[in-house]
Amino acid sequence: MITSIRYRGFSFYYKDNDNKYKEIFDEILAYNFKTVKVLRNIDDTKVSLIDTKYGRYVFKVFAPKTKRNERFLKSFVKGDYYQNLIVETDRVRSAGLTFPNDFYFLAERKIFNYASVFIMLIEYVEGVELNDMPIIPENVKAEIKASMEKLHALNMLSGDPHRGNFIVSKDGVRIIDLSGKSCTAERKARDRLAMERHLGIANEIKDYGYYSVIYRTKLRKFIKKLKGKA
C-alpha cells in the first residue's frame, strides 16, 4: 500500500505507512547520510548508493531543467509518471511478483499537478549486471522471458529492457528502472522487440501491438527516406 501525505513541504508517497521512510527522508534533507557510490551524475539527474541506519538504498533526484512550460501544460492532461510508477510497483509486488526492484518513497515539489523536483528512495539490488556478462546464459534468458511475461500479464512495462537494467542476484534475476507509463499492447511489443535486440530473447508474440510497432517503424523509415531525397 502506498500512503500519500503532505510532509515538509512535499507531496510524499511512501510504502506501507512505514515511518522509517519519513526518517530517511528527514536525514536526506539534513544531508545526514553516507554516499557509498555515485551511480549517475548529470545536469538534471543524480543517482547514488547511500548507507542509512536501515541499510543501503538507491537515492535518486530528478530536477528537469528543460521544457518546463511544456511539462507544466502536459501535467494537466497526463498523469504523474513517478507517482504512477511507485503505485504500480507496489501493486505488482503485492501480487507476488518480486522481479521488479522495490520503490520505497517519492517526494515531489508540486504546483497543481506539476512537479519540479522528484526525490526517490529505491531498493538496491546486489548482484551481477548483465552488462558484466560477455554471454548471457540460456537459463538466465529463460528466467527473464518468463518474468517479463508475468510483468506484462500484470500490465506493467520495463520500458527499456537493455543489459544494464537486469541484475542476477542471489535470489534470481531482477529488473530495475521500470516505466511509469500506461501499459498498452504496443508498449508491451516494444519491450519484447527490445529484449530481442539487446538480450537475444526472440519475440514469439505477433499480436496487434507487434504489427502496430512494425508498421510505424517502416512508415518512419519511409518518410525519412523521402525527406532525404527532397
UniProtKB/Swiss-Prot annotation:
Keyword tRNA-binding tagged: no
Protein name listed in UniProt: Lipopolysaccharide core heptose(II) kinase WaaY
Pathway: Bacterial outer membrane biogenesis; LPS core biosynthesis
EC number(s) reported in the record: 2.7.1.-
Molecular function GO terms recorded: ATP binding; kinase activity
Top EC class for this record: transferase
SUPFAM superfamilies according to UniProt: Protein kinase-like (PK-like)
Pfam families registered for this protein in UniProt: WaaY
Disruption phenotype: Mutation of the gene results in a core oligosaccharide devoid of phosphate on HepII.
Keyword annotations of the record: ATP-binding, Kinase, Lipopolysaccharide biosynthesis, Nucleotide-binding, Transferase
Record-level GO BP terms: lipopolysaccharide core region biosynthetic process
Organism this protein belongs to: Escherichia coli
Main function: Kinase involved in the biosynthesis of the core oligosaccharide region of lipopolysaccharide (LPS). Catalyzes the phosphorylation of the second heptose unit (HepII) of the inner core.
Catalytic activity: alpha-D-Glc-(1->3)-[L-alpha-D-Hep-(1->7)]-L-alpha-D-Hep-(1->3)-4-O-PO3(2-)-L-alpha-D-Hep-(1->5)-[alpha-Kdo-(2->4)]-alpha-Kdo-(2->6)-lipid A + ATP = alpha-D-Glc-(1->3)-[L-alpha-D-Hep-(1->7)]-4-O-PO3(2-)-L-alpha-D-Hep-(1->3)-4-O-PO3(2-)-L-alpha-D-Hep-(1->5)-[alpha-Kdo-(2->4)]-alpha-Kdo-(2->6)-lipid A + ADP + H(+)
